[in-house]
Amino acid sequence: MVSRFPKFSQGLSQDPTTRRIWFGIATAHDFESHDDTTEERLYQKIFASHFGQLAIIFLWTSGNLFHVAWQGNFETWVQDPLHVRPIAHAIWDPHFGQPAVEAYTRGGSAGPVNIAYSGVYQWWYTIGLRNNEDLYTGAIFLLAVAALFLLASWLHLQPKWKPSISWFKNAESRLNHHLSGLFGVSSLAWTGHLIHVAIPEARGGHVRWNDLLTTAPHPQGLGPFFSGQWSVYSQNPDSNTHLFNSNQGAGTAILTFLGGFHPQTQSLWLTDMAHHHLAIAVVFIIAGHMYRTNFGIGHSMKEILDAHIPPGGKLGRGHRGLYDTVNNSLHFQLGLALAALGVITSLVAQHMYSLPAYAFLAQDYTTQAALYTHHQYIAGFIMAGAFAHGAIFFLRDYDPEQNRDNVLARMLEHKEAIISHLSWASLFLGFHTLGLYVHNDVMLAFGTPEKQILIEPVFAQWIQSAHGKVSYGFDVLLSSVDSPASNAGRGLWLPGWLDAVNSSNNSLFLTIGPGDFLVHHAIALGLHTTTLILVKGALDARGSKLMPDKKEFGYSFPCDGPGRGGTCDISAWDAFYLAVFWMLNTIGWVTFYWHWKHITLWQGNAAQFNESSTYLMGWLRDYLWLNSSQLINGYNPFGMNSLSVWAWMFLFGHLVWATGFMFLISWRGYWQELIETLAWAHERTPLANMIRWKDKPVALSIVQARLVGLAHFSVGYIFTYAAFLIASTSGKFG
């Protein structure tokens, strides 16, 4: 018999229905559930797949470099970053008529092209790339690295090169390797690149492989380093009149603590960033020498955790038993990693616009909007995944005996208190915030806008003032001219900080008012509700009052039959499924807020946001409707323009999003009827009927249909907003 998909499951591969295909796809990456799997094989497969993942990332980055070098305008852009539009790649499309060809021929290109809104041009420019040859070199190098990683992936699946299970569970060695080797040494290498290549390039020099070892990045070379006079490296920084990419106004410092932004590029000082990476390198290289491996010195993670016991009171056994629980559970480790990565990704979104590291990024409004939105959505999905794997940990890997009375067990024991507090916070935020918005709407509708309830965010304004923002008149800490901190700051540390905080040219500390107060609490509602659903799903994964035996049913199940009430829609998977809708909803509010506040600032029209954001009609009319006008009229009987593709994507995104409801509301999405109709027509068509459909179409399971519905809802939602964001921003600012 010919082996059929999925090879990893004997039972599924013999299923005569379309369930075989659906369940095969659903469990393809659930290595734990595959036939003949062992713990060792599981670890080896995951290890090899990491190399494959890295190879894909390097291939993708290589493709970016290659296509810009081949079809972009990097060298032209470098001459005038503020006025030349960066080209991502050419468009070859047989459907383009003459109007489309003309509309998409821009940025000095000979034919239709896509404009880059990813910020890669600014990134490459900042780190010292200047011409197409540099881009090609980078592309070829990354291609070689990708090939190397693919080879490593294959190699580590060969019998002689398979790592043992004990190697994978050697937590201290892995910590040392990741801290010192990956974070520490790579930060040191990046410091080296910034000092030897990027900073000289920014000052009009040109350093490449042929003169890298002969060009000293500082006039005094390594002398100050060996003599202990490190402060020499911070003397004579670039002046405020420095022209980026030239020696006009350039200094000689390589490690500084200036603070604020380069006045021309509106990005962080390169010498500050080199200093930052050097500090990170030192800290992490030291951190990577702290854990005990072959040499019998340093800390043992197990001893550290076992020592974490409350000194008295009825506080249980602290972190006892956690070492083995974490070290033997891939889901626990993945949950921790995803939670950390999710937070970091969201922080990247926040910092890329408030403290831009790349030259001229702050003046490329569409790119800023795209990068913020992109990183916030990615963060949302990653964070939801953290809770999903946390729930799977409780179902598959949690051992109550091993964790008796430690922090994990105690968290499960008082889960009702955790869940009810989250519920209370969500209800409070929801009713009060909506109440304020609706009250304000009614006042405007009845012609008495002065009766709105407008609350100044005084605590947040006070915090901004403490950090040096003077416009609120609080006169506290750094915003007080008499405080020792603000006096020291002007000379000793970060002298550029106070200027940056009080400048209107950046997004560092935006002025906030009643509209910000309201939307802040709307976002807080979304965050708390999403967290409530996810936390409840994980904490109730093993069992709840309604269903104490839930852990026998696994991660996802629709119901326990018709005879047992209260068992529907309460699996841990269902919590994840519901939470993703709330996550998307919350990030919708976050990105709406960010985008509307910024376009009004960029247009010099901050009053529009301040006046219209205090009631819901303001958001619907003055943000969504007003900014979608170009999309709604993107192509019409009189022709099209360079926004037409976004107008089409806006429409298409709505279509995909709406398709989700076919699966979400009627549950099964008519899969059985659809496929049977297609198969019937296929088998009655000459030539086509030579190939016959063998799998009997059966209705999607409830869980499958929810997944398909959720996937369409998410993809459509993001497509729609991406088109709206890019078109409305690029339509205004070019």
UniProtKB/Swiss-Prot annotation:
Residue ranges crossing the lipid bilayer per the database entry: 46-69, 135-158, 175-199, 273-291, 330-353, 369-395, 417-439, 517-535, 575-596, 643-665, 707-727
Top-level EC class: oxidoreductase
Record key words, sorted: 4Fe-4S, Chlorophyll, Chloroplast, Chromophore, Electron transport, Iron, Iron-sulfur, Magnesium, Membrane, Metal-binding, Oxidoreductase, Photosynthesis, Photosystem I, Plastid, Thylakoid, Transmembrane, Transmembrane helix, Transport
Annotated binding of chlorophyll a B1, by residue: H654
Membrane topology, record value: Multi-pass membrane protein
Keyword Iron: yes
Reactions catalysed, as given in the entry: reduced [plastocyanin] + hnu + oxidized [2Fe-2S]-[ferredoxin] = oxidized [plastocyanin] + reduced [2Fe-2S]-[ferredoxin]
Gene Ontology molecular function: any one: oxidoreductase activity
UniProt-annotated binding residues for phylloquinone: W671
Pfam families the record matches: PsaA_PsaB
Binding site for chlorophyll a B3: M662, Y670
GO terms under cellular component: chloroplast thylakoid membrane; photosystem I
EC number: 1.97.1.12
Ligand binding ([4Fe-4S] cluster): C559, C568
GO biological process: photosynthesis
Gene3D superfamilies associated with the record: Photosystem I PsaA/PsaB
HAMAP family, alphabetized: PSI_PsaB
Assembly and binders: The PsaA/B heterodimer binds the P700 chlorophyll special pair and subsequent electron acceptors. PSI consists of a core antenna complex that captures photons, and an electron transfer chain that converts photonic excitation into a charge separation. The eukaryotic PSI reaction center is composed of at least 11 subunits.
Job description of the protein: PsaA and PsaB bind P700, the primary electron donor of photosystem I (PSI), as well as the electron acceptors A0, A1 and FX. PSI is a plastocyanin-ferredoxin oxidoreductase, converting photonic excitation into a charge separation, which transfers an electron from the donor P700 chlorophyll pair to the spectroscopically characterized acceptors A0, A1, FX, FA and FB in turn. Oxidized P700 is reduced on the lumenal side of the thylakoid membrane by plastocyanin.
Family statement drawn from the similarity comment of this UniProt entry: Belongs to the PsaA/PsaB family.
Matches recorded under NCBIfam families: psaB
Protein's recorded name: Photosystem I P700 chlorophyll a apoprotein A2
Organism: Adiantum capillus-veneris
Taxonomic lineage: Eukaryota, Viridiplantae, Streptophyta, Embryophyta, Tracheophyta
Gene: psaB
